[in-house]
Amino acid sequence: MATITGSSMPTRTACFNYQGRSAESKLNLPQIHFNNNQAFPVLGLRSLNKLHVRTARATSGSSDTSEKSLGKIVCGMSLVFVGAEVGPWSKTGGLGDVLGGLPPVLAGNGHRVMTVSPRYDQYKDAWDTNVLVEVKVGDKIETVRFFHCYKRGVDRVFVDHPLFLERVWGKTGSKLYGPKTGIDYRDNQLRFSLLCQAALEAPRVLNLNSSKYFSGPYGEDVIFVANDWHSALIPCYLKSMYKSRGLYKNAKVAFCIHNIAYQGRNAFSDFSLLNLPDEFRSSFDFIDGYNKPCEGKKINWMKAGILESDQVFTVSPHYAKELISGEDRGVELDNIIRSTGIIGIVNGMDNREWSPQTDRYIDVHYNETTVTEAKPLLKGTLQAEIGLPVDSSIPLIGFIGRLEEQKGSDILVEAIAKFADENVQIVVLGTGKKIMEKQIEVLEEKYPGKAIGITKFNSPLAHKIIAGADFIVIPSRFEPCGLVQLHAMPYGTVPIVSSTGGLVDTVKEGYTGFHAGPFDVECEDVDPDDVDKLAATVKRALKTYGTQAMKQIILNCMAQNFSWKKPAKLWEKALLNLEVTGNVAGIDGDEIAPLAKENVATP
């Protein structure tokens, strides 16, 4: 167990229920707007001004969530989310989005919520707590320091250590796990062992008083929510270092699988690095048919996290079904997950950042009453910016995503050849594996005036594609939940998707999008059948362009609600079933300080 070496010791803890009574927690203390500088290639300012007026009238009766009362605060659950990413401070995919978006909504419902993640950069809004703890990592004793900020009702805790900061400083966006895509740091096991141990100390040693409703340490009656293999040691250390000594007696662990493809498989001999008793070895034991990272017997962090936790979650109901359907989609952990059971809850999204009514990156703000006027404007601006012929009558397809096998960009590249002779344009935006970046970079040469590939990702352009495109294509071989389709639909941008994971749960064929069917999950080669299915589905979607059916699909898309409200309630219900002492249901509250400024990492 870690030891405290800092001077800031916890002093008290309190929470308030809706009647204002305090309750003690048991503690075990250790020693449409437009930018003037942007021009429109189609339509004029007169059309734009009319659109602005219509949108303003349509939205004038809506209420601002910031003006709503926060409701009654209850002392619900004490929740500690642990992950290698937390948006917007650190994010490479859906994991960071979940840890950024779900906790504030749970906090708004009356729960006390903390996230613990590495301090990869000099985050300007996080301050040193002056609390240090010592943990054993491998054969060394390491000292870690905690940084903290309180945002949108959540205690954001960052673990400070050279294993994180010196490795990634100034390059957070793509260097969290390795020097380049597909290559891991050799000491990742030590890095994330340190994270897990520090995360277990944080609720006990940090005296946090940012909230007017809660103060002091979180104490020990908490639920840890571990996310992906990087935090899979949480339940193991909890049992071996704490419960065995009478600490964290009532604490429970929920383990969430965001992507089964990344399991933390390592050499069997590396088990000794984890400083766990031999009784845990069987939970890590794993044999597969691959010679990476080594031949023969291995340890598997995710397997252990699944087996040792109290409840297993994943990020959509259909993905949960896929994980137990067989070893191809369960990636050889299907039998394990089938034995433990699993709960699938669709992710929400940040509808503050992704809203056509407030998006800071687009020139025209709009809603369902003005979408048919706004999108041609935005399409024309996008076409001009990326170098495609400006013509609002041509349907425009967008792709946004990592260029790797999972996301199916290689399938898309081959499918373009089969529909490029249609009246269509396509823009592909993403970064990733070099071989796939090269495939994208030659699209303009192969299909002049029809296709553009951009391998320098930037957030403003992603927003402009989401708003300006008519369709968004998501040809994933597998997709646990997916966020691009959630972002696109509120903008009236219609998804064309493969039928896998969360895409099945969120996109309804003929109602809010078009399904191509499931694709082969093997990533070694492109399956010609998948190429044909994708091309046929794109052609089918293009036939609806400009029709009344298409207009209805657009309105259906914009009517969808993908906020975190409903997922948060489902999470709450499932976590309450863990029956941690003192935990009670929350309220149907509003997020605390929903308009807080965006956080920016400052190297």
Swiss-Prot record:
Q: What is its main location?
A: plastid
Q: Which residues cross the membrane?
A: none
Pathway the protein contributes to? Glycan biosynthesis; starch biosynthesis
GO terms, biological process: starch biosynthetic process
| One matching Pfam family | Glyco_transf_5
Give a GO molecular function annotation for the protein: alpha-1,4-glucan glucosyltransferase (UDP-glucose donor) activity
- The disulfides recorded in the entry are none
* Keyword Chloroplast recorded: yes
Entries under InterPro entries matching the protein: Glyco_trans_1, GS/SS, Starch_synth_cat_dom
Mind telling me which GO cellular component terms the entry cites? Answer: amyloplast; chloroplast
Q: Which CDD domains match?
A: GT5_Glycogen_synthase_DULL1-like
Which residues of this UniProt protein bind ADP-alpha-D-glucose? K91
Give the stretch annotated as transit peptide in the record, renumbered to this chain: 1-75
Q: Which tissues does the record link to its expression?
A: Expressed in pods and leaves. No expression in flowers or stipules.
EC no.?
2.4.1.242
The subcellular localization recorded is: Plastid, Chloroplast; Plastid, Amyloplast
Per the entry, what this protein does is: May be responsible for the synthesis of amylose.
- Family membership, please give it: Belongs to the glycosyltransferase 1 family. Bacterial/plant glycogen synthase subfamily.
Q: What is this protein called?
A: Granule-bound starch synthase 1, chloroplastic/amyloplastic
